[in-house]
Swiss-Prot record:
Polar residues bias spans: 174-187
Pfam families per record: Porin_1
Family under the similarity heading: Belongs to the Gram-negative porin family.
Quaternary structure and interacting proteins, as annotated: Homotrimer. Probably forms mixed heterotrimers with OmpF; other mixed heterotrimers are also probable.
Residue numbers spanned by region Disordered: 174-195
Coiled coil: none
GO BP: any one term: monoatomic ion transmembrane transport
Signal sequence residues: 1-21
Topological category with respect to the lipid bilayer: Multi-pass membrane protein
Gene name of the encoded protein: ompC
Role description: Forms pores that allow passive diffusion of small molecules across the outer membrane.
Annotated protein name in UniProt: Outer membrane porin C
Naturally occurring in which organism (per UniProt): Enterobacter cloacae subsp. cloacae (strain ATCC 13047 / DSM 30054 / NBRC 13535 / NCTC 10005 / WDCM 00083 / NCDC 279-56)
InterPro entries associated with the record: Gram-neg_bact_OMP (IPR050298), Porin_dom_sf (IPR023614), Porin_gammaproteobac (IPR001897), Porin_Gram-ve (IPR001702), Porin_Gram-ve_CS (IPR013793)
PANTHER family in alphabetical order: OUTER MEMBRANE PORIN C, PROTEIN YDDL-RELATED
Length: 363
């Protein structure tokens, strides 16, 4: 019986963190779920900036309220707290915080700190035990989590086509702490963005197959264009992906092409970049889930005579074992394929392997 329960449970644990949430309140159309996890995590690497304790916890809630038969209000908040730093250090941050309204089959609208629509597709490969999903990053235009997202989503195309989902999104400017690009939440150039728009379409074809595409285009700030790498009026992202999720097998791949939107270490952005991620996993009924993946990001026509350079390139081999719905452990080996050379050193790009060992309690 335990084996059968695990085989049904594990796929649910691999989606949003709130899938295993604890229901705190559910009465009169009002519902509140609390979720979280503690990851006792350690990295082993020759890279001194990565090697060592990486323990952290995440805590969040999801709530909704039934206004009437066709209108539902909802909100979500998620916070991360690092457990590998001293008590006098402020090392925590908000991952998401947004509120919205759902209008029956007409779709939903929300605003706040959320995921960019590009992640609707690239998230399909962001399922590795520890690493992965790093051909893009947070607070990088509309590629992952960011501030000031206004998002309209529609599931099953107004209730007419099962599995056909689309989203349209706007992101407001997040500029610098002072000067021409100043906004109330100023930040460094690598995490700034101008006004942006994006959209995504995903279609579940049935039998476990899915296909999706997403695009985004954001204005760049003048501060960003003061950097040497990746000058241009706009940052653009075009992505497409495929996945298969059935019969205990998970396969996914995504290809993304960007213009002035993929970071070149700590130097700026690539004028053009080609990003590729592919992952394969299998879920055994007794709780073991092995995983293998390949990720590469290649920058094109880089300044200072660097030309074409790999910004990221590695093979990932790992496995997760689920004791039950609340407890798991994993190992993840990032086999770095980048060479240590002038470019990687100047850009601050690590070329060392990393082995991650984690023990996770989640609710």
């Amino acid at each position: 019986m335990k084996v059968k329960v695990l085989s049904l449970l594990v796929p649910a644990l691999l989606v949003a963190g709130a899938a295993n949430a604890a229901e705190i309140y559910n009465k009169d159309g009002n519902k509140l779920d609390l979720y979280g996890k503690v990851d006792g995590l350690h990295y082993f690497s020759d890279d001194d900036s990565q090697d060592g304790d990486q323990t952290y916890m995440r805590l969040g809630f999801k709530g909704e309220t039934q206004v009437n038969d066709q209108l539902t209000g909802y909100g979500q908040w998620e916070y991360q707290i690092q457990g590998n730093s001293g008590e006098n250090e402020n090392n925590s941050w908000t991952r998401v915080a947004f509120a919205g309204l759902k209008f029956g089959d007409a779709g939903s609208f929300d605003y706040g700190r959320n995921y960019g629509v590009v992640y609707d597709v690239t998230s399909w490969t962001d399922v590795l035990p520890e690493f992965g999903g790093d051909t893009y990053g947070s607070d990088n235009f509309m590629q992952q989590r960011g501030n000031g997202f206004a998002t309209y989503r529609n599931s099953d195309f107004f209730g007419l086509v099962d599995g056909l989902n689309f989203a349209v999104q706007y992101q407001g400017k997040n500029g610098s702490a002072s000067g021409e690009d100043q906004t109330n939440n100023g930040r460094t150039e690598l995490r700034q963005n101008g006004d942006g728009v994006g959209g995504s379409i995903t279609y579940n074809l049935g039998e476990g197959f899915g296909i999706g595409t997403a695009v985004s285009s954001s204005k760049r700030t003048s501060s960003q264009n003061d950097l040497t790498y990746g000058n241009g009026d706009r940052a653009e992202t075009y992505t497409g992906g495929l996945k298969y999720d059935a019969n205990n097998i998970y396969l996914a791949a995504q290809y993304t092409q960007t213009y002035n939107a993929t970071r070149v270490g700590n130097l700026g952005w690539a004028n053009k970049a080609q990003n590729f991620e592919v992952v394969a996993q299998y879920q055994f009924d007794f709780g073991l889930r092995p995983s293998v993946a390949y990720l590469q990001s290649k920058g094109k026509d880089l300044e200072n005579g660097y030309g074409d350079q790999d910004l990221l390139k590695y093979v990932d081999v790992g496995a997760t074992y689920y004791f039950n719905k609340n407890m798991s452990t994993y190992v993840d080996y990032k086999i770095n394929l980048l060479d240590d050379k002038e470019f990687t050193r100047n850009a601050g790009i690590s070329t060392d392997d990393i082995v991650a060992l984690g023990l996770v309690y989640q609710f």
